Amino acid sequence: MAQGSGDQRAVGVADPEESSPNMIVYCKIEDIITKMQDDKTGGVPIRTVKSFLSKIPSVVTGTDIVQWLMKNLSIEDPVEAIHLGSLIAAQGYIFPISDHVLTMKDDGTFYRFQAPYFWPSNCWEPENTDYAIYLCKRTMQNKARLELADYEAENLARLQRAFARKWEFIFMQAEAQVKIDRKKDKTERKILDSQERAFWDVHRPVPGCVNTTEMDIRKCRRLKNPQKVKKSVYGVTEESQAQSPVHVLSQPIRKTTKEDIRKQITFLNAQIDRHCLKMSKVAESLIAYTEQYVEYDPLITPAEPSNPWISDDVALWDIEMSKEPSQQRVKRWGFSFDEILKDQVGRDQFLRFLESEFSSENLRFWLAVQDLKKQPLQDVAKRVEEIWQEFLAPGAPSAINLDSHSYEITSQNVKDGGRYTFEDAQEHIYKLMKSDSYARFLRSNAYQDLLLAKKKGKSLAGKRLTGLMQSS
């Protein structure tokens, strides 16, 4: 495993203080990491752990790291040590081997040290092309530990659409990387795979996690050398990526020229012309959304019927058993098309309406594609063929109406079927249903009768309850 050392920090930039406002922090973290890995001065014990039929090489536990921080940095409170460990992990210097969320836990969770090549002090600014190569490479290796997470699969589909014209080049680069990796020792390959994954967890974090590579705009303005060098992680050389994957130590820091100033002025003028919403409009939209959903928030509006887990009212169970949607539920379907698609009962009602108009194939196709994304990999190809034959093939029994562009793209995708083969077709059908079928459903007697029936039922129940109270 590639371990950190003082000499290995030489892969950084020429003058740290001139290159990144965060370099002082990186240097301090790297000093801690170097000492943590130094066996001679009492570093953290790095060991290989046996796990059932396999071995997990070069790992440390979260407890060992926390205890080392408390002992060597004179930290008395374990919470403070865990917080410091989480900050170091968030920068990618330490990472959990089985989780995409970079945080520190004071337990037996296994962690691994990042290779110095991937340290943030190297001022990485990886391109989307590199990310596409990485994700594509992961899909080529049939290993459980390398399976894409849901958000990674979505990112891959988005990148595949964005780089459609040069996807063949990306695929070839990924294949070349896989061939190189296969020549490496099994243990070394396992370690490098995890380090590479941790690198991308820092630069393309899990949705909901903070991106620690983003820099404060005020710090950026204070830089004497604002030219950020873009580097390819895999050494890809293109017009947009001609830089070496590592900065050269001897590279001098050049002075700002007139051309640099002109480029900066052009960039700032472009920023001025960008379309930005006024804060008043944003606040107005947020208030409208809050007012619309306030009655569905149990923290603000008491739920009706009340929660049976915290009260003696069991009416909720009766409603669920009856399979009849409440008035609130029916009303919510009218908020947006996504609301009715999220609700199982709403989808069933919408499907019945479409069947009555002999146009249910659009919704059935959309649901089939959603189900395809959740299928096991071994069943995907078969399911893709079934969907094609049912909805898109010439003479299909439930043919859907696609524009020529979407149909052509889908026809090409079917030749090499995957979970996202019908992405363009699904998006087209979604927009079609949202603009046409959904609007007609809200105006239909089926929806209006359902909504009025719930209101009428509620008013009759209220009158019945009032009568019982008066008689008693």
Curated annotation (Swiss-Prot):
Stated role: Regulates G protein-coupled receptor signaling cascades. Inhibits signal transduction by increasing the GTPase activity of G protein alpha subunits, thereby driving them into their inactive GDP-bound form. The RGS6/GNB5 dimer enhances GNAO1 GTPase activity.
One Gene Ontology term, aspect cellular component: cytosol
Protein location: Cytoplasm; Cytoplasm, Cytosol; Membrane; Nucleus
Source species taxonomy: Eukaryota, Metazoa, Chordata, Craniata, Vertebrata
Gene3D superfamilies linked to this entry: 1.10.1240.60, Regulator of G-protein Signalling 4, domain 2, Transducin (heterotrimeric G protein), gamma chain, Winged helix-like DNA-binding domain superfamily/Winged helix DNA-binding domain
Domain remarks: The RGS domain interacts avidly with Galpha and mediates the acceleration of Galpha-mediated GTP hydrolysis.
Gene this chain is encoded by: RGS6
Ranges for domain RGS: 336-441
Keywords: Cell membrane, Cytoplasm, GTPase activation, Membrane, Nucleus, Signal transduction inhibitor
SMART domains, per the entry: DEP, G_gamma, GGL, RGS
Matches recorded under Pfam families: DEP (PF00610), G-gamma (PF00631), RGS (PF00615), RGS_DHEX (PF18148)
Residue ranges constituting the G protein gamma domain according to the UniProt record: 261-330
Assembly description: Interacts with GNB5. Interacts with RGS7BP, leading to regulate the subcellular location of the heterodimer formed with GNB5. Interacts with GNAI1.
Protein name per its UniProtKB record: Regulator of G-protein signaling 6
Primary site of residence: cytoplasm
Record domain DEP: where: 40-115
Species: Homo sapiens
Effect of W309F: Diminishes interaction with GNB5
Top-level taxonomic group: Eukaryota
Membrane topology classification: Peripheral membrane protein
Any GO molecular function: GTPase activator activity
Any Gene Ontology biological process: G protein-coupled receptor signaling pathway
